[in-house]
Amino acid sequence: MALMKLFIASALFSIATAQYLYAVDLAVPTTYSQIQCFQQAKYANLFVRVFKPDGSTGQVDMDGIYTYKTIQNNNLPIGVDVYMKPDTLAKNTGAQQFDMVYQALTKNGINARRVFVQVTIEDTPWNFDHNVNIQFLNSLFLRAKQLGILIGVYTSASDWQTITGNGATLVPSDAVLWYYSVYWDGVTGESVPSFDDFVAFGPFNKKSVVVKQFAHAETVCGLNVNRDVFMKA
């Protein structure tokens, strides 16, 4: 029986790796050698945080900026995307926070066509009023559209329901979804590394999905990261 389980697990892994590429998302400083380590470990992409809450207006996360620039300036053979974790209880609007992201990227010579917006309840206090949260997100989405930046949303079905109540949001029609499905932290809490468990919610359907986080809080190349999969082009 144990051998059969091992065979099935191995077969599923082979299927997953045939259709998907692996990535990590992180919110910690990285070095040149650690980025090389990710690439050597067959990770095809990094998702780096470029904005984080600070209890006031939110602030640019320079760790993510530096990681992106290290990859870009050294022509390292690994992809990189950016995400922002908005300060949902800050004094400024979603639009103003997106402006801070855009200005930081532009100032540092980063031409990111898409910014993923983290809409999760983990370590992020949202308003109890769904309408306030929707207004914040709509402000951010509209500003991105004005600046010509595509939007991705990082969330889950339960978080989206908790934060927006599945109310009408101005999620752009060309927005893509990065969803997470993890049982608990660490290797034993991983879900299947594929999109097979996705169920449509809110404005998102199967066609929206481009990335899935299937593992949370693991150590890779000496860093605390989350692990993801995305479809091969």
Annotate each PLM feature:
Residues 19-150:
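Substrate-binding cleft of extracellular glycoside hydrolase catalytic domains
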